[in-house]
């Protein structure tokens, strides 16, 4: 699954959202990266996915939650989809992934942002690109 981000396009499915993160996840290489896709209230893409962090801290993605929301507000987002890649190729979310998702969802709601999804990407076959799991569809 690969796709170029088209600002102004609409995101209606988890597969469309995951496709928009592929290029930025490739840039992370063997590092775990965390990204935010800012949307308007109707699901229109306002900007390309924004890299919020790269690397690990204590074995999990090094995510400063303030940076997630700062990136969203900087472009006037009403909604966000977040994603991160698992360089290991394992799609299963960790307990830390699930905990972070719940924290982001709660804080987004408090800030008046719609938290749509958290996508995990994993490269399982270089010719294919990335597989993904949607936490909104599968876990939340």
Residue spans of the language-model regions?
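N-terminal beta-strand/alpha-helix entry module and adjacent surface
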Residues: 1-77, 93-115, 122-140
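Short, solvent-exposed loop/turn segments at secondary-structure junctions
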Residues: 88-92
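Residues embedded in well-ordered beta-strands within globular domains across many folds
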Residues: 81, 119-120
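Conserved beta-strand edge residues that scaffold enzyme active sites
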Residues: 86, 120-122
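Short beta-strands and strand-loop turn motifs
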Residues: 80-86
């Amino acid at each position: 699954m690969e796709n170029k981000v088209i600002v102004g396009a609409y995101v209606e499915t988890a597969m469309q959202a995951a496709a928009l993160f592929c290029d930025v996840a490739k840039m992370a290489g063997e590092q775990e990266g965390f990204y935010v896709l800012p949307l308007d209230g109707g699901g229109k893409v306002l900007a390309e996915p924004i890299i919020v962090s790269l690397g690990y801290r204590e074995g999990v993605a090094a995510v400063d939650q303030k940076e997630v929301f700062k990136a969203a507000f900087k472009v006037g987002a009403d909604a966000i989809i977040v994603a991160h890649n698992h360089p290991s190729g394992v799609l299963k979310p960790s307990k830390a992934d699930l905990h972070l998702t719940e924290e982001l969802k709660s804080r987004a709601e408090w800030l008046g942002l719609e938290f749509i999804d958290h996508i995990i990407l994993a490269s399982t076959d270089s010719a294919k690109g990335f597989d993904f799991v949607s936490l909104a569809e599968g876990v939340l």
